Structures are given as C-alpha cells and as structure tokens.
Swiss-Prot record:
Gene: frd.2
Name of the protein described by the UniProt record: Uncharacterized 14.8 kDa protein in frd-Gp32 intergenic region
Source organism, top-level taxon: Viruses
InterPro entries given in the database record: FRD2 (IPR004885)
Length: 128
C-alpha cells in the first residue's frame, strides 16, 4: 500500500481478513459503513514491516491506530493482500457492479490461438 492511494476490500478476501484477527471485523465495518473505500494517510515502517496507521474514508471520516475500541484502525503488511486498489466507477455498469460482491469483470479477446490461455486465466481468477 502507498500513502495517497485508495483501497477497498477484495470481496473474495473479507473472510480471510476477519480470520486473521478479531479486531479486523471492526475494520471491515469501518470501511463498509464509511463509503466502501479509504485513502492511506500514514504508514509506519517497523522492523522491516509496513503498517497502515491512518486512513481517511470515502465520507471523510478519519481512523487510525490511536483509536479506541471500534475506532481502532491499523493494517499490517501481511494483511495487504486482502485489499485491492480502488478505482472510481466510470460508467453506470461499473457503479452497479461495485455494489455486487463476488463479481469480477474481465475484458479479453479470445480466438483459436489463445483460448487455452484465457481458460487458464479464468480458472486462476476464480479459484484464488
């Protein structure tokens, strides 16, 4: 993750994220209740690992590692795989898709020369 970039939970990784730590369920709630994405405002590097220590949510709410209880927010580098970079919806189709979990949109051109590669790509994408 990088300061200034926006991220959202990867819908396929929410359960994995919650299973890592009991406090992660609260952080899922923070993200979902405050617009569905956040921008990284602060990262701390400690002992060779990066930690996101402050975010600003889509609705402007700020959370950090100084928060108490339900307001606490901190991500360790080992949890970054549960997130993906957020992209602003550019069309009505994207806006609808963003509200549906477990949907992955793939644009590809398939012909007789690459059909096996595309099938393998689809398998890898949906069996992650």
């Amino acid at each position: 993750m990088e300061i200034g970039k926006k991220y959202e939970l990867n819908p396929h990784r929410i359960k994995s994220f919650i299973d890592i730590s009991s406090s992660n369920a609260n952080m899922v709630g923070i993200i979902q209740e405050n617009g569905g994405w956040f921008e990284v405002k602060s990262i701390l590097s400690l002992d060779g690992f990066d930690y996101v220590t402050e975010i600003i949510c889509a609705n402007g709410e700020i959370y950090n590692d100084d928060g108490m209880g339900d307001d606490y927010f901190e991500l360790s580098e080992e949890e970054f795989y549960c997130f993906r970079e957020y992209k602003e919806p550019t069309s009505e189709e994207d806006k609808v898709e963003d509200k549906v979990y477990d949907v992955t949109k793939i644009h590809c051109i398939v012909d007789e020369n690459n059909v096996d590669e595309i099938i393998e790509l689809l398998r890898k994408t949906f069996k992650a």
